[in-house]
Amino acid sequence: MGTVVYQQGFQSQLNEPRALRLRLSSPNPHFSQPFGLALKSHLLDSSHAEDTRNRNDDKAAASPVSDSSGWSSLQSLSSGSSSSTKTTTSSEKESSYYVQRPSSCRALSDQSLALCTENLGSESGSDVTDIDELFSLDVQTKNLGETTTETRTLKSRKRSVSPSDLPPPLTTMRGFQCIQMRPHRENGRLVMTATNAPPRNGCFQADRSNGRLRLSILKDSNEFVENEEETIEPEETEEYEEEEEEEEDEDEDEVMGIENVQVSRRCVQGDRENRGLLNWESFCVATS
């Protein structure tokens, strides 16, 4: 007997090698065996050969199916990859189109179009300006300039007024010496100190009496006025005399009154000496 072994080269490595076993009768018959046993063995061999053939046919039929399934799986994978690439390319195209659309195609609203075509007077001739509007604009600009200058002058005046002049210097109960209050800060507190004010050539003097503030004319005011009159040039004095003569001629019917001015000044406290009445010199007042 002999055995034949063969292996399919075109199949995949997963398939195991297949072997066929055939039993062949020897050319020299053995007459020692009975004829019935020989027939039985021949029948068994033939049946076994048929079974093996059927198995081979089934496996051969199954192999293309397996090959086709393998090819189909590979094709499905390739088709899936191709479809995925197609979907990605299509999505990229859509996204790029969606992104580029606003930059390339922008829809203008009615307001924007109106703004664009509002001042195209060279084409339609509708851009006409009124003279009244131009003058009104000029007036507005002038008013703004005046207001700005006024505000600047007010600020400069506020800066020029020194806060040290307020409150004005006042006289004391003991004498005519003027005292002025000076504020200053010390350790986070406001401290008011009384300082002697420098003498001023003023016509009025401030003093307190009976809980009130009174202004009185200084004694040296007439001398101060006389000194100022002496400094006037002679030409100005002549013109001044001529004007006085003309006024006297016109005011002949007017009456000249003489008034005596007396100011009473007393101390509030009784322990101190009372101040006497001050007799002021009389002066003339002309009324027209």
From Swiss-Prot:
Phenotypic effect of disruption: No visible phenotype; due to the redundancy with other FAF genes.
Residues in FAF domain copies: 165-217
A Pfam family: FAF
InterPro entries from the UniProt entry: FAF (IPR021410), FAF_dom (IPR046431)
Ranges of Low complexity composition bias in the record: 66-90
Stretches with biased composition (Basic and acidic residues): 48-60
Chain residue ranges for the region called Disordered: 48-100, 146-172, 222-261
Tissue spec. comment: Expressed in the shoot apex, stamens, young leaves and young siliques, but not in old leaves. Detected in provascular and vascular tissue, but not in the vegetative meristem. In inflorescences, restricted to the vasculature and absent from young flowers, except from anthers.
Acidic residues bias locations: 223-256
Job description of the protein: Able to repress WUS when constitutively overexpressed, but have no effect on CLV3.
UniProt xrefs under PANTHER family: FANTASTIC FOUR-LIKE PROTEIN (DUF3049), PROTEIN FANTASTIC FOUR 3
UniProt similarity note: Belongs to the fantastic four family.
Identification of the protein by name: Protein FANTASTIC FOUR 3
Native source species: Arabidopsis thaliana (Mouse-ear cress)
Gene name linked to the record: FAF3
